[in-house]
UniProtKB/Swiss-Prot annotation:
Keywords: Membrane, Nitrate assimilation, Transmembrane, Transmembrane helix, Transport. Expressed in roots. It is found in: Membrane. It holds the Pfam family PTR2. The lineage of its organism: Eukaryota, Viridiplantae, Streptophyta, Embryophyta, Tracheophyta. Belongs to the major facilitator superfamily. Proton-dependent oligopeptide transporter (POT/PTR) (TC 2.A.17) family. GO terms for cellular component: membrane. This is Protein NRT1/ PTR FAMILY 2.1.
């Protein structure tokens, strides 16, 4: 759901030019998205179990690999977004990424089909198991690299390409709504049907279904290529930011001026408000817009070196990015705690009683579907119930930062409940009666509620505060933060494993509950840091045509 803003009009009909772009592209885009979503979630949700059962990798090491993969899945979309914006356009990037993903999932299917591509399975009751060879790991990592790169290349690009097919903001918003619903539908299908197939039929069939979904989505997308509007690469949005920094450094000895006419302004862009004097914050950057004899052409008075002279608007755009950086840092610990909890929950589920009756056994990798369902339900409740009631009582709307704060509180509460549940589970281990897997559901429901508050609100903050030229990048900033968080969760688990005895390979002999309490303490400190940042933060003034619907779920 990263980078998406839900339209309040869930039943809006998508209109547009049915000859090139518009409504004729809708079934191709949505079908492609559904297939890619089924594929991506189908292999990643159960990755820890696959590594443990098929590669004889220890549980904590498997969790570490899973966190690294999830980190790449969250961070690489920004790289592909820059490639699409700067060089190739969205349509070629999606085509190439879908094909790369197909190669990766096909290789995973081969691994699960041929025994010589993976170590021999552990014998029943045996403690010593064959470790994977360099060849086994090489093939595995190649498959993971391909499918990760391919999946990442379609996430942001499909959202942008789909929205670009329409001209009206209402139609774009409606497409984003369908995008969100389709991604989560694919995730739920994978977390239930695909994961169940992997654990109860075979890994080969499970990965084979993912490969089939990927192949169909690739064919569907290519089939509709002649109907798409092809966006032209517009250059990297980061170039302007870099130029401001370079220009400010080159003029570091220049004395700033208090006269408006001494600063270079960008008056030709009608979409922007004409800014006179640069703001007082981050004053050292103001030199980038300060005119000097070296910066201007003597004949026409125009700037002849954009790396020495930037406009006041460009300087203010850079400042707006710097202002939200402290808020962005606050996301990192939230994502870290979620990453640790996701990994530990799978390991906990593997040592609980997952049988709901004599025949059905809940797959460990399917538990994360609870987070998705909880998040979706509360996104709707927030939009139609909670936010309107709050507005009626207080005559004010919850700001995005207030929503982020509420989400962080739910996140802390979820970690505390996870600690309590794990302490109870360890007591049942002593009594030799495995705890029911259903005890793991309440903290997952609560973390999903937290996601419904803070994730989309963070997207709204960055979308509103970033420069107009970086709005597409702004929608992926939250995803980048969570990508880094997965790497941090890997580092945190590694640190705890090295310095304590809380995380042995058999968590029945460890203290995972203490790990959760560490996350609670860190969450409280992070919440305090966020409150301080929010107190001093002021929202950027956005033109009316860029403001969001007051009934939008991110308000």
């Amino acid at each position: 759901m990263a980078g998406l803003v839900l339209s309040n009009d869930t039943e809006a009909k998508i209109s547009g030019d049915c000859k090139r772009g518009g409504c004729i592209t809708f079934p191709f885009m949505i079908a492609t998205l559904l297939g890619i979503s089924v594929t991506s979630y189908g292999w990643v949700l159960n990755l820890i179990v696959f590594l443990i059962e098929e590669y004889n990798i220890k549980s904590i090491a498997a969790a570490q690999i899973s966190n690294i993969v999830n980190g790449c899945l969250s961070m690489l979309p920004v790289v592909t977004a820059i490639l699409a914006d700067s060089f190739f356009g969205n349509i070629p990037v999606i085509s190439a990424s879908a094909f790369i993903s197909l190669l990766g999932i096909f290789l995973l299917t081969l691994i699960s089909s041929f025994e010589n591509l993976r170590p021999r399975p552990c014998e029943t009751g045996s403690i010593l198991c064959q470790s994977p060879s360099k060849l086994h790991l090489g093939v595995l990592y190649a498959a993971l690299a391909l499918v990760t790169a391919g999946t990442s290349g379609t996430r942001v690009a499909l959202a942008s390409a789909g929205a670009n097919q329409y001209d009206k903001p209402r139609d774009k918003g409606s497409f984003f709504n369908w995008y969100f619903l389709t991604v989560n539908t694919g995730a739920i299908i994978s977390a239930t049907a695909i994961v169940y197939t992997q654990e109860n039929a075979s890994w080969r069939l499970g990965f084979g279904l993912c490969a089939a979904a990927n192949l169909i989505s690739f064919i569907v997308f290519i089939s509709g290529k002649r109907f798409y509007k092809h966006d032209k690469p517009m250059g990297s949005p980061f170039t302007s930011l870099i130029r401001v920094l370079v220009a400010a450094i080159l003029k570091i000895k220049v004395v700033t001026s208090s006269k408006e006419e001494d600063y270079h302004r960008e008056v030709e862009k009608e979409s922007k408000t004409c800014i006179g004097m640069p703001s007082k914050s981050f004053r050292f950057l103001n030199r980038a817009a300060l005119k000097s004899e070296k910066d201007l052409n003597q004949e026409d008075g125009l700037c002849h070196n954009p790396w020495r002279l930037c406009s006041v608007e460009e300087v203010e755009d850079f400042k707006s990015v710097l202002r939200v950086l402290p808020l962005w840092l606050a996301i990192l610990f939230v994502g870290t705690s979620i990453g640790v909890q996701a990994s530990m929950t799978v390991l906990q589920a593997l040592v609980t009683d997952r049988g709901l009756d004599s025949k059905f056994k809940v797959p460990a990798g399917s538990l994360q579907v609870i987070v998705l369902i909880s998040s979706c339900v509360f996104l709707v409740l927030n939009n139609w119930t909670i936010y309107p009631i709050y507005q009626k009582i207080t005559h004010k709307q919850l700001t995005p930062l207030q929503q982020v704060g509420i989400g962080q509180v739910f996140n802390i509460l979820s970690m505390a409940i996870s600690a309590i549940v794990e302490a109870k589970r360890l007591k049942t281990v002593e009594n030799e009666h495995p705890m029911s897997v259903l005890w793991l559901l309440p903290p997952l429901v609560i973390v999903g509620i937290g996601d419904a508050f803070h994730y989309m609100a963070n997207v709204a903050v960055f979308y509103g505060e970033f420069p107009e030229s970086m709005r597409n990048t702004a929608t992926s900033v939250t995803s980048v933060a969570f990508g880094i968080s997965f790497y941090l969760s890997t580092a945190l688990i590694n640190l705890i494993q090295r310095t304590t005895a809380w995380l042995p390979d058999d968590i029945n002999h460890g203290r995972v509950d203490n790990v959760y309490w560490v996350l609670v303490i860190g969450g409280v400190l992070n919440l305090g840091y966020f409150f301080v940042c929010s107190w001093y933060f002021t929202y950027r003034k956005i033109q009316d045509d860029n403001r969001q619907d007051p009934k939008d779920v991110t308000n």
